[in-house]
Amino acid sequence: MEEFQGYLELYRSQQHDFLYPLIFREYIYALAHDRGLNRSVLLDNVGYDKKSSLLIIKRLISRMYQQNHFIISVNDSNQNKFFGYNKNLYSQMISEGFAVIVEIPFSLRLVSSLEETETVKSYNLRSIHSIFPFFEDKFPHLNYASDVLIPYPIHLEILVQTLRYCVKDPSSLHLLRLFLHEYYNWNTLITPKKSIFAKSNQRLFLLLYNSYVCEYESILLFLRNQSNHLRLTSSGILFERIRFYEKIKYPVEEVFANDFPATLWFFKDPFIQYVRYQGKSILASKDTPLLMNKWKYYLVHFWQCHFYVWSQPGRIHINQLSKHSFDFLGYLSSIRPNISVVRSQLLENSFLMDNAMKKLDTLFPIIPMIGSLAKVKFCNTSGHPISKSSWADSSDSDIIDRFVRIGGNLSHYYSGSSKKKSLYRIKYILRLSCVKTLARKHKSTVRTFLKRLGPKLLDEFFTEEEQIFSLLFPRTSSTLKRFYRGRIWYLDILCINDLVNHE
């Protein structure tokens, strides 16, 4: 960060806050190669690590100085127009470098805001599991929840326009448009499964998408909090969680006060809560369903009028928390009453009182998980374990390590489940699938293979947490029983592991 700040101060004095000249500097691509300001396991530079070198970077910069290479022939789409060769490599290098450059002002703004508010930076807030304690604290007191799918922009120009409030350099925005027009089909780039979370050029498009979501959430927070410039601590924490730093000091109230003079009281609700992860959000309230419907249709019109994004009211579902569960971050969560009986003694008379309290119930999604295991050939659609034939050529230790890793990840992530019986069933499927895979490799039966290895094979599937607790407490102790029954939220989980990645 100190190195970045030094470079930026130098160019501020020379270029009047222009970021465009930084793209011609070698250290920018070196920082992009090293994942720049914020290292993250979510952003893997596939192919870029193996092909990047100082010679290629120097060649790239020298070719960018030759302006005739930027001439675009729209009619001839089959030619390699930018540099003549190594188009994919150069485009990925430019996108990574540009993403690092645009992140500089956001990172510096975050540091300055933390210094002004004297906020201690908590890395625990980055964990996905940190959302569930918030659910446990707030949602039992709420009545209705809206399941909102944030629509993707139809055109990438919308994403570029959201950066104009933060990036005051027109040359950088023009370069971004040139890059997107040159290398991508704007109509198909933002499909959620193939592009915006793709491994190639992921950092740049996460930056664009986060700027779009940040713009949407900043206006939503303004209407919710009716505050100036969104300088609340809660908004700062929200932007820290999405890795997109603090919103620029932009007079939001001057823009929207004239457009919504009678709307602020219309949506005033002190009990409304908002949670989001990627493109899915939950909007919960203690008020009546009428207010939730007003929020629903307001969001639809807001997306259509402000972002020119088509959305339908059917994409937003309003459910009563006491009667319906909501799917969020892989858990099926619901609010159920927890009735406790209290015996009261008054002089010679005694009577029983039922004390009903609402409690958040987080369930393990057994049916979708079996479908995921069946998709990657660990079991059939009925949940019956089968051998993993594609792993039969690997060594025994490699096969066991793969199964143990998947089982450990599932146990670690779903440790907050209220009822772990379904989780144990999934672990049983993985154990038996591992045994069948090893038996198939050695051309033996499952029974014979288990007799030869004994119980040591199954001990490999105990998670690290279970091993530690089993050493500290006896198997019959009440503490260990509470460990197996209770919910545990870990603050070191930054992403959801996909089973397909273990193919």
Curated annotation (Swiss-Prot):
List residues traversing the bilayer.
none
Give the source's domain of life in one word: Eukaryota
> What InterPro entries does this protein map onto?
Domain_X (IPR024937), Maturase_MatK (IPR002866), Maturase_MatK_N (IPR024942)
Gene Ontology MF, one: RNA binding
Query: Keyword Membrane, does the record have it?
Result: no
Where are the coiled-coil regions? none
Task: Provide a GO CC annotation, any one.
Answer: chloroplast
For biological process, the GO terms are: mRNA processing; RNA splicing; tRNA processing
Q: Name one Pfam family in it.
A: MatK_N
Q: Which keywords does UniProt give here?
A: Chloroplast, mRNA processing, Plastid, RNA-binding, tRNA processing
| Cell location | Plastid, Chloroplast
The protein's matches in PANTHER family, at most eight in alphabetical order, are given as: MATURASE K
Q: Which family does it belong to?
A: Belongs to the intron maturase 2 family. MatK subfamily.
Chain's role: Usually encoded in the trnK tRNA gene intron. Probably assists in splicing its own and other chloroplast group II introns.
Q: What is this protein called?
A: Maturase K
Q: Which gene encodes it?
A: matK
